[in-house]
């Protein structure tokens, strides 16, 4: 039952506390009391008033303090707002009253319905009346100006509270919608199935929907940011509605699934990544981590410069790879611990230390060398045989004076050896570039695992990098230091000696590759090409286009040989022999590859033959018919070539296979062979005649479709000075580790199902090629 306002008595007890609420309370707390509770409160209050009526009026407590507290407290304004009265009805000041005499009871009056309606109507027009308007309104309604002032003040507080409640409700609703939508996308990714066979979708196949998922993810992030900004305005601090994913492919689908950077040459960062994919989510919180990163980088730079300049006893000389090779330096762990007690701290349990140093004079200026090292794309291209993926996660400093002096950036890099039997090494580090006081330049890497710990640490970079000294005539002297701690227990036995010696990932391989690539880049810019040699390409534009096409071929080959997860290959289980790894990918809308299903088969094995002899045999077109099944026994001729450096084995060639069958058309093969102190490569791909004519005339090579195949030849370990050893696997054997890899188009329809017959054919092809090579080089190695 509702009680008219005029019959509702005051609800102030003897202690001045309010038992009930005025009509204004219903504005801010409409559901505070239900009907039954209201009746009980009213009956209880009637009993209180019966007792109060027996007390003289002078003993009633004054409400002066309560009025002031209600007026000054916005939260308590709701209770006061419906009460009115004068603060001292007798006109006697508080100081003049007898302290022994109880104060008279304060008389309060409810605002009438008419007064409330008039003030609410005025509030709609003007929520902030001035003194003149309040006085005029109080005169019209028969109220004190102070009563009008407090009513408007409390009314504004109520409206603000209502608005905030509405906004909070809307934010909660939007938040729940986004959360549900985000969960739907996660479930869709986790339960995706192959449209052909109904089985789980292969990692590479997820790229078909990746573009749409990226767009949707960006939209969701914008919506989250908008809502968080609104919430922060009312709550007073930023809100994070959703937890941030922190483990990329560590759980098989852990790298920020939708918002990923793109690797060089258009290869997208893997959606589900591999062991180190989580680095992408370990972005630097600049304000918090930057001072620590800077301090770590400066200390690492100091350590690198000293390690590059000091000799014995810090560095000792190891036996050379052969009689013509330079001596290789290794680090003394005891001296290192004594000279650099700080650094990254003690070696992690289960990790093996690996350190090496090498130097060379290369044909490139210091400025160009620094630019290559500080640009992730150029870095991955120049060292494509060592770096399978390089991503700059965050640039903390771009340097000063228009160069890279002082540049600081956080990177994630995956290092590789060209074999499926050697796991890649993933590292998360800061790269720092500095010009020293003596004019030399230094670029140093040091792991950030101390700031961003990884649950599974398999590769930790202690200060590593290079010191670059400018030389006359555009040359530079480069001193390279590699110092890492690794878990290499997964390396196959035939590669353990190579890896443990530091030849697989060490400084000699970096310096050898850099020297060879500098010569290659110099040949691109060469202008004094002799025209007397037969088959030499003299056109400047033709040379550039052909070398660019060959570079793409080499990068594609290296990306399909190793166990890297950065190139969207899907390994097939149960594909045949255990020593052959078969992978597949779908090629769609890629002008550099033929459309369809591509199979990649790779295997590695040991040969009791020196690496140079294997390299010369495989690159020689006259002996190609002994191992190349696809040439069908035809005669192979070199039509054109481009020399790439001092060693005649470094060149790009265009070969023609003259088929012995008159019904078959002749085939062109693009081949690049390269060699240095750390290893050799022979990589080739069939090419279209019309497309190659365009390239030789300086046309764009990016639209030439090719699938590379070839060989990577590495020594089986450090050899004793001067000889090939006894032919057995071990230190000083002088044998070779040969990796054979084929990329073959098995179906021109990308949506077709992969047949087991195609896999068997590729396995048979690679097995037959391996047997032919073994037979041929073994026959050559026998003394005549």
From Swiss-Prot:
Classification via InterPro entries: GLABRA2/ANL2/PDF2/ATML1-like, HD, Homeobox_CS, Homeodomain-like_sf, START-like_dom_sf, START_lipid-bd_dom
Coiled-coil residue windows: 158-234
Disulfide bridge positions per record: none
Lineage top rank: taxon: Eukaryota
Feature: DNA-binding region: 104-163
Keyword terms, alphabetized: Coiled coil, DNA-binding, Homeobox, Nucleus, Transcription, Transcription regulation
Molecular function GO labels: DNA binding; DNA-binding transcription factor activity, RNA polymerase II-specific; lipid binding
Comp. bias (Basic residues): 102-113
Entry's Gene Ontology cellular component terms: nucleus
Domain named START: residues: 286-523
Region feature Disordered, mapped onto this chain: 60-113
Family of this protein: Belongs to the HD-ZIP homeobox family. Class IV subfamily.
Function in brief: Probable transcription factor.
Protein's name in the database: Homeobox-leucine zipper protein ROC2
Organism of origin: Oryza sativa subsp. japonica
């Amino acid at each position: 039952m509702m009680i008219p306002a005029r019959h509702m008595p005051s609800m102030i007890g003897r202690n001045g506390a309010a038992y009930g609420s005025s009509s204004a309370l219903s504005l801010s707390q409409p559901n505070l009391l239900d009907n039954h509770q209201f009746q009980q409160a009213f009956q209880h209050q009637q009993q209180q008033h019966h007792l109060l009526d027996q007390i003289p009026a002078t003993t009633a407590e004054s409400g002066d303090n309560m009025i002031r507290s209600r007026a000054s407290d916005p939260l308590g304004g709701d209770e006061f707002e419906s009460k009115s009265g004068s603060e001292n009805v007798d006109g006697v000041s508080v100081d003049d009253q007898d302290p022994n005499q109880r104060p008279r009871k304060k008389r309060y009056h409810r605002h009438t319905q008419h007064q409330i309606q008039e003030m609410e109507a005025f509030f709609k027009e003007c929520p902030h009346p001035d003194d003149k308007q309040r006085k005029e309104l109080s005169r019209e309604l028969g109220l004190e100006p102070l009563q009008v002032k407090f009513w408007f003040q409390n009314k504004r507080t109520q409206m603000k509270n209502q608005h905030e409640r509405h906004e909070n409700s809307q934010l909660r609703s939007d938040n729940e919608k986004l959360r549900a939508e985000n969960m739907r996308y996660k479930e869709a990714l986790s339960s995706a199935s192959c449209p052909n066979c109904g089985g789980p979708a292969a990692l590479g196949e997820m790229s078909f929907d990746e573009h749409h998922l990226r767009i949707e993810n960006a939209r969701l992030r914008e919506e989250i940011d908008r809502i968080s900004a609104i919430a922060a305005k009312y709550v007073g601090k930023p809100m994070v509605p959703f937890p941030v994913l922190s483990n990329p492919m560590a759980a098989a689908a852990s790298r920020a699934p939708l918002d990923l950077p793109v690797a060089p040459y258009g290869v997208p960062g893997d959606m589900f990544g591999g062991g180190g994919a989580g680095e992408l989510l370990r972005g630097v919180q600049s304000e918090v981590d930057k001072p620590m990163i800077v301090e770590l980088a400066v200390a690492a730079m100091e350590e690198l410069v000293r390690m590059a300049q000091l000799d014995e006893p810090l560095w000792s000389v190891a036996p050379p790879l052969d009689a013509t090779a330079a001596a290789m330096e290794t680090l003394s762990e005891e001296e290192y611990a004594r000279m650099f007690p700080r650094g990254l701290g003690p070696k992690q349990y289960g990790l093996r230390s690996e350190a090496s140093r090498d130097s060379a004079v290369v044909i490139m200026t210091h400025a160009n060398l620094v630019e290559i090292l500080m640009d992730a794309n150029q870095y991955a291209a120049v060292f494509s045989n060592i770096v399978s993926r390089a991503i700059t996660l965050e640039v903390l400093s771009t340097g000063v004076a228009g160069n890279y002096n002082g540049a600081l950036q956080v990177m994630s890099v995956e290092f590789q050896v060209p074999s499926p039997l050697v796991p890649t090494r993933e590292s998360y580090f800061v790269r720092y570039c500095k010009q020293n006081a003596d004019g030399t330049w230094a670029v140093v890497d040091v792991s950030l695992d101390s700031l961003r710990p990884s649950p599974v640490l398999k590769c930790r970079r202690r200060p590593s990098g290079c010191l670059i000294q400018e030389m006359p005539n555009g040359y530079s002297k480069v001193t390279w230091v590699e110092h890492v701690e690794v878990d290499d227990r997964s390396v196959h036995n035939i590669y353990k000696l190579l890896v443990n010696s530091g030849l697989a990932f060490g400084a000699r391989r970096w310096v050898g590759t850099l020297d060879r690539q500098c010569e290659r880049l110099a040949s691109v810019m060469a202008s004094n090409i002799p025209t007397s040699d037969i088959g030499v390409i003299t056109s400047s534009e033709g040379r550039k286009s052909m070398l660019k096409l060959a570079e793409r071929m080499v990068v594609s080959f290296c990306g399909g040989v190793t166990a890297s997860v950065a190139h969207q290959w899907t390994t097939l289980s149960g594909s045949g022999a255990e020593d052959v790894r078969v992978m597949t990918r779908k090629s769609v809308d890629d002008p550099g590859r033929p459309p369809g299903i591509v199979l990649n088969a790779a295997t590695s094995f040991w040969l009791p033959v020196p690496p140079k002899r294997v390299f010369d045999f495989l690159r020689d077109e006259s002996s190609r018919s002994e191992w190349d099944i696809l040439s069908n026994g035809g005669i192979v001729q070199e039509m054109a070539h481009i020399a790439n450096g001092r060693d005649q084995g470094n060149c790009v060639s265009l070969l023609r296979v003259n088929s012995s069958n008159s019904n078959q058309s002749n085939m062109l093969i693009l081949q690049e062979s390269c060699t240095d102190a750390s290893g050799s490569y022979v990589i080739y791909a069939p090419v279209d005649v019309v497309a190659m004519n365009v390239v030789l005339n300086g046309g764009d090579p990016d639209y030439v479709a090719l699938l590379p195949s070839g060989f990577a030849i590495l020594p089986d370990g450090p050899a004793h000075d001067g000889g090939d050893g006894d032919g057995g696997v071990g230190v000083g054997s002088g044998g070779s580790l040969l990796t054979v890899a084929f990329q073959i188009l098995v179906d021109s329809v990308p949506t077709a199902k992969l047949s087991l017959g195609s896999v068997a054919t590729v396995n048979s092809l690679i097995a037959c090629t391996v047997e032919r090579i073994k037979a041929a080089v073994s026959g050559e190695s026998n003394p005549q």
